[in-house]
A protein has these predicted regions:
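N-terminal helix-rich module
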Residues: 7, 11-45, 49-135
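Residues within membrane-spanning alpha-helices of integral membrane proteins
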Residues: 3-4
C-alpha cells in the first residue's frame, strides 16, 4: 500500500503547478531593488549615467552596470511606469541613474493573484524602496 502511495506521489507531484508564493515574490522584489541600488551606486562611483533595462513582457530586468539579470517566473505579471523621456532622450524602457545619484524615477510592479509588490525609484534622490500592493 505504501509503495502505491509513493508511486502516485511521484507521478502527480510534478504535475501540480508551482505558483510563486508571496514570500518568494517579495524576495524577487528585493532582488530587483538591490539591482537598481547597485546601478545607482555605480553611477555615483563612476561619475557616469547607468541605465537599468526593463523588459516587462519578457519579465526581465538587467543591470546597466554589471549585466546581471533578474528573470521573473511566468506567473508573475510585471508592469512598469517610467518617464517617457529622461534628460535629452527617450527613456526606452529604462531607469537612468545619474552621477549625482538622481534618476528619472519609475515604478516596477510585480504582481500575481492575491497581491504583489512595487519597486519604486525616487526621481529626486534615486532612492529605491519596496512597497507591498494591498489587494
Amino acid at each position: 500500500m505504501l509503495a502505491i502511495i509513493a508511486l502516485l506521489a511521484a507521478i502527480l507531484l510534478p504535475v501540480i503547478p508551482h505558483a510563486t508564493s508571496r514570500p518568494r515574490l517579495e524576495a524577487y522584489a528585493v532582488d530587483v531593488a538591490s539591482l537598481l541600488t547597485l546601478d545607482r551606486n555605480t553611477a555615483i562611483r563612476r561619475h557616469a549615467q547607468i541605465r537599468t533595462q526593463i523588459d516587462a513582457p519578457s519579465r526581465l530586468i538587467a543591470s546597466g552596470a554589471t549585466g546581471r539579470q533578474v528573470r521573473l517566473p511566468d506567473d508573475v505579471v510585471v508592469s512598469t511606469m517610467v518617464a517617457a523621456r529622461c534628460g535629452d532622450r527617450p527613456s526606452g524602457g529604462t531607469i537612468t541613474f545619474f552621477a549625482s545619484g538622481m534618476s528619472c524615477g519609475g515604478v516596477i510592479a510585480l504582481a500575481r493573484p492575491g497581491g504583489g509588490f512595487q519597486v519604486r525609484v525616487n526621481w529626486l534622490t534615486g532612492g529605491v524602496e519596496v512597497v507591498a500592493i494591498v489587494p
